[in-house]
Amino acid sequence: MSRRGTAEKKKAKSDPIYRNRLVNMLVNRILKHGKKSLAYQIMYRAVKTIQQNTEKNPLSVLRQAIRGVTPDLTVKARRVSGSTHQVPIEIRSTQGKALAVRWLLAASRKRPGRDMAFKLSSELVDAAKGRGDAIRKKEETHRMAEANRAFAHFR
């Protein structure tokens, strides 16, 4: 057994303008090459675009999008007697949110166009309405877990 204590879980910090943890999670995932100010710029422009286009509270749209994309189940490869099975496992809410943020950003990067803020805002609005690539990814993951339900006892 390890003599060290377990590492304490760090709480996600909130961003300076909206005081929101989800915004900060998104900013930290947008971040490339240490350019955090650019990541904040992209995020705040996306939020502004959401505000103008939907005329709703952009933070509620963001929350709704992340809630819609957050998966409940995922599959994990488990090797059993020489063959690898995709075993469905339940995931915690923090891990689910992290996956949702990752999928939203991947889907928005895939969208056509040059402006990342516009692509991100349109992906968030689509996800809040229940469509878009990120939602498709969640449904695909759930389908995989459902298809491999027979291997759930390998957990």
Curated annotation (Swiss-Prot):
Keywords: Plastid, Ribonucleoprotein, Ribosomal protein, RNA-binding, rRNA-binding. It is found in: Plastid. GO terms for cellular component: plastid; small ribosomal subunit. The keyword RNA-binding applies. PROSITE patterns: RIBOSOMAL_S7 (PS00052). One of the primary rRNA binding proteins, it binds directly to 16S rRNA where it nucleates assembly of the head domain of the 30S subunit. Belongs to the universal ribosomal protein uS7 family. Part of the 30S ribosomal subunit. PANTHER family: RIBOSOMAL PROTEIN S7. This is Small ribosomal subunit protein uS7cz/uS7cy. It comes from Cuscuta gronovii. The gene is rps7-A.
